[in-house]
Structure formats: structure tokens, C-alpha cells
A protein has these predicted regions:
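Short Pro/Gly-enriched beta-strand edge/turn motifs at strand-loop
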Residues: 4-6, 63-66, 96-104
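Hydrophobic-ligand binding "helix-grip"
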Residues: 73-126, 134-136
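A conserved amphipathic terminal alpha-helix motif
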Residues: 128-130, 134-173
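Short structured motifs
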Residues: 6, 18-20, 66-68, 114-116
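Hydrophobic pocket/interface hotspot
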Residues: 32-37, 43, 70, 83, ...
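Short beta-edge strand/loop motif at the mouth of beta-sheet-based domains
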Residues: 21, 41-82, 86-92
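Hydrophobic ligand-binding cavity/cleft-lining segments
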Residues: 1-61
Length: 173
């Protein structure tokens, strides 16, 4: 099975916090689910933890792509982000979308994260969807002590919402 590609500074186990959620779904493909992540303007419709998504330099509702800069609020944090990896899935290749997100601040308040998603077609008509986030900073260390379980539940809800929309073939515009 495939794994998230980690820049060295975000290698899990060496950061202040790490969260991982995963699901396997029969009857869908990576190609069918992936657009529900790349169309970030609809996240709030299937995941209560995300809101106020704004893609830099666009008045329309474009898709996330390599190099896209955007901002959003996730579970109360105003995050600035840039897509650092983007690979559309195909029958023989997993889809990948990762961004570096940060909350500006000083050494006590700055928060950096690498959030990666992987969409992998599996045997027997299944898709594996993995999301992982590796976090750096004092706020991340505090989250690890007090709220890691809530992050896990939130990320699982994000995956479940994506799958639900893909099953229902919800329009993306």
C-alpha cells in the first residue's frame, strides 16, 4: 500500500503531533472521490469542521492544484496553506493532495502542519482513502496532550463526508 510523502521536517514521530484517519469503501473509485477534496469550496457542506475556504487570486470556485494558495478555518484555527503535492488518481496511480498549512505567530503561537490525503484504488472495486497530518509548534504539542482524539474524530468525519457526497454524486459547482 502507498503512503503519504513527508518532507523531512514533517516526518511523523519527530513532530509535536500526528493524526491519521483512513477508510476503505466498496463501490467507489479514487477518481470518483478525489474531486470532493479538490473542490475545497464545498468542504463545509460535508464537513462541519471546515469553513471560510478562500483560494487566492480567484473569484470563481476553482479546484486545488499544485501551488494553489488558500486559506480556511478548521476547528477554530484560521489557516493559510499552499498545495505542495498534487497527483490526480488514475486506474494505476494513487491520487495525492498535500498542503503545508500554518497559523502565523511567534515561537509560542505559530503552528505548522503538513496535511496529506491519499486516494488508492484497491482490488475488488474498493478505494482506500488516507488522511494524515503532522504538526509542529507549541500549539501542536498542546493538541497532542489534550485534543488528539478530537482531531482523529474530525478527520474521520471529513473522510466520511467526502465518501457520502461521492456516493450521492453531489454536484461540484
Amino acid at each position: 500500500m502507498e503512503a503519504i510523502h513527508w518532507p523531512k521536517e514533517f516526518t511523523p514521530g519527530f513532530t509535536d503531533n500526528f493524526v491519521s484517519a483512513e477508510t476503505y469503501v466498496a463501490g467507489l473509485t479514487a477518481e470518483e472521490v478525489f474531486p470532493y477534496l479538490t473542490h475545497a469550496h464545498i468542504w463545509h457542506e460535508y464537513y462541519d469542521g471546515a469553513s471560510d475556504v478562500k483560494l487566492s487570486g480567484s473569484d470563481e470556485k476553482p479546484e486545488l492544484k499544485e501551488g494553489t494558495k488558500f486559506s480556511f478555518n478548521i476547528i477554530g484555527w484560521d489557516v493559510t496553506a499552499e498545495v505542495v503535492e498534487f497527483v490526480e488518481p488514475s486506474k494505476d496511480r494513487p491520487g495525492r493532495l498535500s498542503w503545508h498549512g500554518w497559523v502565523p505567530g511567534d515561537e509560542n503561537t505559530r503552528f505548522d502542519a503538513l496535511h496529506g490525503f491519499l486516494f488508492e484504488n484497491m482490488p475488488d472495486g474498493r478505494v482506500r482513502i488516507l488522511t494524515q497530518e503532522s504538526e509542529i509548534g507549541k500549539p501542536a504539542a498542546e493538541l497532542a496532550k489534550t485534543h488528539s482524539a478530537s482531531l482523529l474524530v474530525g478527520f474521520q468525519a471529513w473522510l466520511d463526508g467526502m465518501v457520502d457526497f461521492a456516493r450521492k454524486k453531489i454536484r461540484l459547482d
